[in-house]
Amino acid sequence: MITSGIQPRAKNMKKNQTKTNDNGLKSLENKWGKNVIAQGWTGVPNTLIERQQALGLSSLDVNILLILLKYWWDADSPPYPSKRVIGEMVGKEESTIRRCMAGLERKGFIQRTANYLSLGGQSSNTYKLDGLVLRLEQEAKALAELKETRKEEDARMRRGTPIPTTKGE
């Protein structure tokens, strides 16, 4: 069952182009209700959810990344929500959001670009998520290996074959 609303690209589609799947949208509506889905939804990689601890992400880090994902509509257009908006969504002061986002930047998950208005003053920053994508790709490989190891261990257990252990256990 497709729940992301997105199908793999067809042969005649460009590399980053995707096709909406009406069945996927119907599936989301069946789960959440039409009124909820009408307000929008965000695709979140399971790797971000499953490997957040391995990535060294706090709950607030993940919440902020989820908000950035909410505003990231196109791979070539970085999201640009204001710290005020992010703070309102997670119930934190702008100073807390600033510190957390600085940490995400230090860890290489996001890259902040300051934007300035033509008449002077600063506008909302844009946030490139290339670092997050790269780290999730790395973690996805680790997750796949972990799942394969578990699958092999489960098969051994079903056959009654002992699982090899390392010295010191």
Residue ranges and their predicted role:
Residues 77, 92-100, 116, 131-136:
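Short, charged low-complexity intrinsically disordered segments located at boundaries
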Residues 82, 115-137:
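Short, cationic-aromatic polyanion-contact patches
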Residues 1-37, 106, 131-169:
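Charged low-complexity intrinsically disordered patches
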Residues 1-89, 95-96, 102:
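Short recognition helix of helix-turn-helix/winged-helix DNA-binding domains
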Residues 98-99, 112, 121-122, 135, ...:
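Short, intrinsically disordered/low-complexity patches at protein termini
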Residues 106-115:
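A short, conserved structural fragment
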Residues 88-90, 105-107, 121-126:
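Short alpha-helical linear motifs
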Residues 45-48, 113, 126:
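Basic, gly/Ser/Thr/Pro-rich low-complexity segments located predominantly at protein N termini
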